[in-house]
Each structure stands twice: as structure tokens, then as C-alpha cells.
UniProtKB/Swiss-Prot annotation:
Function (record text): This protein binds beta-galactoside. Its physiological function is not yet known.
UniProt modified residues of type N-acetylserine: S1
One function term, GO molecular function aspect: carbohydrate binding
Name of the molecule in the record: Congerin-1
Superkingdom of source: Eukaryota
InterPro entries per record: ConA-like_dom_sf, Galectin-like, Galectin_CRD
Domain Galectin: 3-135
Organism lineage string: Eukaryota, Metazoa, Chordata, Craniata, Vertebrata
Protein residues bound to a beta-D-galactoside: W70, E71, T72, E73, Q74, R75, S76
Subunit structure: Homodimer.
Species of the source: Conger myriaster
Keywords: Acetylation, Lectin
Amino acid sequence: SGGLQVKNFDFTVGKFLTVGGFINNSPQRFSVNVGESMNSLSLHLDHRFNYGADQNTIVMNSTLKGDNGWETEQRSTNFTLSAGQYFEITLSYDINKFYIDILDGPNLEFPNRYSKEFLPFLSLAGDARLTLVKE
């Protein structure tokens, strides 16, 4: 359950960011986060295979205060990822919302609650091995 953090990332309004890789064989969860830092996340995209009370659920949220500042979650049970499989997620955003395109899966939207136009921080954490990050 390693993690990757990229700082000084050039993810601005109108650009696309694609991350891909392989899900572990017995996953609990993995998340993709974009924002200004680990404590200021405009999008927390958490795939929960089997985590707490959640099974096969995508949870999206945001925070300006790290773990003490989580806002209202948005959830989707349109869950198409599975253990051991390749995944690819493409993100883009504008001043109002994020657009999330999961390969062979749902297209989701999430509000850009803080109206940020420059998100230099990317992190990936949890039960997946990253093989692709491209802008």
C-alpha cells in the first residue's frame, strides 16, 4: 500500500490528466487526489472495494484542512474496477466542476468547490500499482 506524490504538477483548467495501472489482487481501496497539498484537496477520488462499511463504491470529497476538514461526500455505486485488473482514469476540470472518465466505466462529475484553477499536487495511495501518469 505504497503511495506516490507529485508536487509542482502543471494541472490547470482545460488540461487532461490520465493515471493508469494495475489493481492489487485483494484490494481494500485506492485513491487519486488532486489539490494544492495533502491538506488542501479539491478532489479526493476513493475507490472502495471493501473498506469499512463500503463495498464497490466510489467516494468523492474535498478538504481544505486535511483529515479534519472533509466536506459532504458524493458516492457512486457504478463501480467497474476489479482486483488484478488494469485501470485508467482521466481527469479534467473547469472553474465549476471536475470531469472523471473511468476507462470502460462511468463518467462522473464532482463540484470544484473551491473554484481553483491551478492544482499542482497529485497523490495516489492504496492498493494499486501505478504504471501511467500523463498530461
